[in-house]
């Protein structure tokens, strides 16, 4: 390569980067994710009892001020699984986190932020769930554990399933979401308010809940819940 061409490469790269920056949409333009924050509560979701909850101060403090939350705790309404009347029965947590203007300060890769909440030994793998409307979606399934207390010295096991929902997109990994977001910014001129949808619960043999039972209940809730809140007409 001739010296002149080599000298021009940095300038060409800088011009290309400047062009990308200028091509990005304005900061105040956000396209809403194709998912409703209004998860059903009470007995509105057949087979389940839902109770709306508030995000914690810890969750709020580490995310941008314009991050939006929607959280509902569910218990199976059938005594064949576990009763919402039993205050000691496991709860299945469903949450949606909507990004703000600065997505990097609103939505994080779960495998990175969950350890900060006390979860450890995280392992992830791809999974698919068939929904009640006949559609099949890809998820990431995380297994982890969290200490019950220093005095006990043992842990509860946790299962989480998650996806990212954009405008007309459902992505099962953080990398897929980032790539889609970059494509939309560069080629369609849009900035999306991405939503992070997660459902999880805990299990332990000494409380009478096996991993298989916990996993089955989480999958059953997702199968019933997502058809109610995803805006399928956008897909």
Region annotations inferred by a language model:
Residues 41-45, 115-117, 193:
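Generic detector of short, well-ordered, non-transmembrane alpha-helical segments enriched
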Residues 52, 57-185:
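Short, solvent-exposed recognition patches
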Residues 47-49:
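Short conserved aromatic/hydrophobic patches within beta-strands of well-structured domains
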Residues 4-19, 127-235:
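A short, solvent-exposed beta-edge/loop patch
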Residues 26-45:
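Alpha-helical transmembrane signal-anchor/signal-peptide segments
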Residues 19-26:
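Alpha-helical transmembrane segments of multi-pass membrane proteins
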